[in-house]
């Protein structure tokens, strides 16, 4: 893994920082990347590009909270792609969770979502955001019921799920051409730290093997099909495409 510093800016977080550094098997060495425990949350910083700002997970406020309240509910393309309809709340495995935005949208609409995240730094950010959201007075109740996280390689996690989800959702990292300033910032930090999803093509057959009803792959509108496998249908949005592979066994 790329070297990363773990820093406790808040003295009360010193023990948590030490535990995280041990878990990540990181010494307190110099690195352009730092996981920083502040008073409010855990955040990732690229120290040699401070203008990029910090990256952290926040399910309670900001863009994801706005989308939960005003994003179109079950009429959203992602909801249609996973098969959300009246009386049907699919169980979903998000095998490429990242910062958990899509998983959160699906959970807020009623899905039971298990997030898988391969990179330990991203998983640490996600775990912190999840814990804070579960303690929130407004959304904590259903967050505890509907969202969970497993860290580790996606392929291994898929093969060792122990249950059959209705849907496996894939959104492998892809070089984005046009994105909002926020995502551009995050992509620059992420791609230099995390790297590309080199096993992305292999994820599709693995997902098809474990999903009960469908596999959904989110792609930029200009990207080819994952693993060059043509889906049964596609749902197009302004800048993305949801390729849907329906399971027939």
Swiss-Prot record:
Return one GO MF term.
Answer: rRNA (guanine-N2-)-methyltransferase activity
Where it sits in the cell: the answer is:
Cytoplasm
Can you list the GO cellular component terms from the UniProt entry?
cytoplasm
Provide the reaction this enzyme catalyses: guanosine(1516) in 16S rRNA + S-adenosyl-L-methionine = N(2)-methylguanosine(1516) in 16S rRNA + S-adenosyl-L-homocysteine + H(+)
Q: Which domain of life is it from?
A: Bacteria
Ordered alphabetically, the record's keywords are: Cytoplasm, Methyltransferase, rRNA processing, S-adenosyl-L-methionine, Transferase
Q: What is its EC number?
A: 2.1.1.242
Q: Which residues bind S-adenosyl-L-methionine per the record?
A: 101-102, 117-118, 171
- What CDD domains does its record include? AdoMet_MTases (cd02440)
**One Pfam match, by short name?**
SAM_MT
Q: Briefly, what is this protein's role?
A: Specifically methylates the guanosine in position 1516 of 16S rRNA.
Q: Which HAMAP family does the record associate with it?
A: 16SrRNA_methyltr_J
Family recorded in the similarity comment? Belongs to the methyltransferase superfamily. RsmJ family.
Q: What is this protein called?
A: Ribosomal RNA small subunit methyltransferase J
Q: Which organism is it from?
A: Tolumonas auensis (strain DSM 9187 / NBRC 110442 / TA 4)
